[in-house]
Amino acid sequence: MTTSALRRQVKNIVHNYSEAEIKVREATSNDPWGPPSSLMSEIADLTFNTVAFTEVMGMLWRRLNDSGKNWRHVYKALTLLDYLLKTGSERVAHQCRENLYTIQTLKDFQYIDRDGKDQGVNVREKVKQVMALLKDEERLRQERTHALKTKERMALEGIGIGSGQLGFSRRYGEDYSRSRGSPSSYNSSSSSPRYTSDLEQARPQTSGEEELQLQLALAMSREEAEKPVPPASHRDEDLQLQLALRLSRQEHEKEVRSWQGDGSPMANGAGAVVHHQRDREPEREERKEEEKLKTSQSSILDLADIFVPALAPPSTHCSADPWDIPGFRPNTEASGSSWGPSADPWSPIPSGTVLSRSQPWDLTPMLSSSEPWGRTPVLPAGPPTTDPWALNSPHHKLPSTGADPWGASLETSDTPGGASTFDPFAKPPESTETKEGLEQALPSGKPSSPVELDLFGDPSPSSKQNGTKEPDALDLGILGEALTQPSKEARACRTPESFLGPSASSLVNLDSLVKAPQVAKTRNPFLTGLSAPSPTNPFGAGEPGRPTLNQMRTGSPALGLAGGPVGAPLGSMTYSASLPLPLSSVPAGLTLPASVSVFPQAGAFAPQPLLPTPSSAGPRPPPPQTGTNPFL
C-alpha cells in the first residue's frame, strides 16, 4: 500500500465518509494513473440508488472545484462524470445541466508545473468533450445505448465462462484490485465478472463486432490519409533548393554543349530536331551580327548627321596631310547655314582646288594660308564662304585687311563672299600689294619722330613725310593732352545744378577758387602731362630764416645761411663739436651748382641747440683753425 492510499484511508475514517464517497475519492485520487474501469462501473451502479446518488454527486462536485495543484483530481472527476453520463442514471445528466456553469468555468483552467509544462490542457480538452455531450441530447442517447449493450454483453460473457476461466478472471481481478489498494478487493468474490481486464473488454467477442472494429479502423486510416499535407519543414526547403540548383546546372550544361557544336554529345546524338536547331544556330548568329552592324552604322550616321555633312565624291587632288582620309571631302552648303565652310589650317591647300566645307570646328579658309616654311600658294576665287560666328547678312563684309600682332598690316584681296582671312603663323606673301603695304606700314629710312629713339646711338632729328609730322611710338604728349584737358561734357555733368537743382546757384564754386596748374612745356616724352617742380621750396618760403647758434654767439646780423655769401671765410663762425658743419663753411669748389633749386634752404631745417649757450655753460672755446679740409 502506498503512502497516498494510507493517507486516504485515515481521512476516510476521520471524516466518516460513506462507502459511495470512499469509492469516488478512490477513483479521483491524486495518483499518476487513471481511474480503474471496474471501480467506475461500481460507482455507476450506485447512481441508481437515491441516497448513494446524492453522496456520489456531492463528492464529485467537490473534486471539480479543487485547486490548480490538484489538477489530477479535476481531470479524473471529469473522466468519471463522462462515464456516469453514458452508463449511470439519467439523473446524472439532469443535475449536470443544472450545474452547467460549474463545468463551463473549467474551460479556462490553467496550471504549469515545475518543468514548465501546462497541465491545464488536459482539463480543458476533457471539459469540451463533456460540454458537447451535454448539449447534444441525441448523441448522449446513442452513447448511453451503446454503453449499456456493451455492459450487458460483458455480464453475460462472465456468467457463461467455465469454472477455470472464471477462476482465472477472479484471480486476475483480485490481483489487479489489491495492487492498487482498492477497498473493492475485499468484495471481489461478489463482483468477479466486473473486474475483468480492459483487454478482455476491448477484444471482440463475435464476428459482427470484429467486422465493426475493422470498418472503424479503415475509416480512421482513411481520415488520416485525407488530412491536408503539413507545410514542408526547413529540411524539405533545403532539399528543394538543392534540387533546383541541380536542375539549373544541368540546363546550363546543356546550353554550353549546344553552343560548342560538334564537340558536344548532342552533335552525335539522334534527333532531327536537335540537328535542325544546330543548323539554324549559324544563321541566328549571322542575323545577330548583321543587326549589331546596322545598329552601329545607324548610330555613326546619326552622329555624322549632327556633326559632319554628307559625304562627297572623292576629289582628284592629293593631300599632303598624313592623317587626311582620302575621298572624304564634304560638300559645300549654302551660305545661310549655321556651320560655315572652313578648312584645316594645318594642311596645305594646293592651287586649283576648290575650297570645300570641312568640320565645323575647323578654322575658316585663309587666302594666304600655307605652312610657315613653305611657299605661299595663290588661290583662285572659289565659292562663297561664310563665317559661322559672323552675321548672316549678305551685304555684310568683314574688313579686307587683317592685323598682324607681330608685324605690319597686310592687305588681302576679298573673296566673293566678302570674308577676309588671316593666318598669324603664315609667311607674308611676296606680292606687289603686300610690298606696297609693307612700305607704307614699315618706317622709312627717315626718322618719323622728333627724336628718333636709338638705344645705342645719339638722338637724331626727324623730318616730316608728306607734309605732316608722323607720331612717335613713345610720344605720350597726345595722351597727356587728353588727360589734362577734360571734356566739356564731363564738366557739364559735374555741375551742381545737374543734380541739386536751381537751389545750388547760391553755393560757392570751388573750381573757380582753385586755379588749374599750368602744363610745363618740356621735350621729355616721359614727363608729358606732369607739372614741373617748383623752383622754390613750398615749405620754407613763408618762414623767416632762424639764426644759427654760431650767429647768435658772434652777434652777426645775418638771419640765415641762405642770405650770406657762398664764399664766406671759414673763420667767420665758431665751430661746435655737437653741431653739424654749416653750408657756409664748405669750400667754394665743393658747392652745388646754382641750377639745382630743389633742395630747401638750410636755415629752415637747422637743428635746435643740444648744448647750453657759451654764456651760461662757461668760457668760450677757442676758435677752430682754418684749413681746407671740409670734414674738420
UniProtKB/Swiss-Prot annotation:
Residues 172-214, 257-296, 326-501, 525-560, 604-632 are annotated as: Disordered. It comes from the Eukaryota. Induction: In keratinocytes, by wounding or contact with collagen. SMART domains: ENTH (SM00273), UIM (SM00726). This is Epsin-3. Residues 353-371 have a biased composition (Polar residues). Residues 524-631 are annotated as: 3 X 3 AA repeats of N-P-F. One of its GO terms (biological process) is endocytosis. Transmembrane segments: none annotated. Residues 276-294 have a biased composition (Basic and acidic residues). Its main location: cytoplasm. Gene3D superfamilies: 1.25.40.90. It is found in: Cytoplasm; Cytoplasm, Perinuclear region; Cytoplasmic vesicle, Clathrin-coated vesicle; Nucleus. Keywords: Cytoplasm, Cytoplasmic vesicle, Lipid-binding, Nucleus, Phosphoprotein, Repeat. The gene is EPN3.
